Amino acid sequence: GQEINITTYNLCRINMFLHDIDYDKFDIALGDTLTDPQHWDDEPFEAIVSNPPYSIKWKGDNDPILINDPRFSPAGVLAPKSKADLAFIMHSLSWLATNGTAAIVCFPGVMYRGGAEKKIRQYLIDNNYIDCIIQLPDNLFYGTSIATCIMVLKKSKSENSTLFIDASKEFVKVTNNNKLTQENIETILNAFKDRKDIEHFARLVPNSEIAEQDYNLSVST
């Protein structure tokens, strides 16, 4: 893994030790994942989990080096300078194995904003890389009350469609925060595995229909 914030980086390493994972069994690097990735020699990966910072600034736009970076070039555009969200998604997709799965926590604006971000969503949908969008409850993560989403990526899907799950009501209130219980998690996972329509909760949408909706990936659409 890789983390740019030194405090979070050190906490991550401490967490490994607390779970009895020896130093030689993990490789967590300190640095900028987008402009200075540290694991070129290790990719591709069969499992990727990421909770990147929401809508941070980066070089982006028309940077001549990044636009030719093999992680970002397939979409034909770069994520905007003011919003790096989809750059993290393209990075994860690039380093994902053909038989792998990636899950990235996303700021909701990623799902509907226009411009370059719409073009990147179009690339992801037209190439059938998005497996599922899961709408999470608000007030779930530390530091933000915004209702985030999870985008699940796969490169070897059997059908040309995308599953949408509205899990915004799947939580219990704990003091001032919301929390997913094991029962909530099981409900979401069962819908994810079954890939069937469930009224007011899950819907499997053909990618052609998503294209007709201007590549808007909002679960409430």
Walk through the language-model features, giving the residues of each.
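Conserved SAM-binding loop
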Residues: G1
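A conserved structural/catalytic subdomain of Rossmann-like adenosyl-cofactor enzymes
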Residues: D42-T221
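S-adenosyl-L-methionine
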Residues: I4-D42
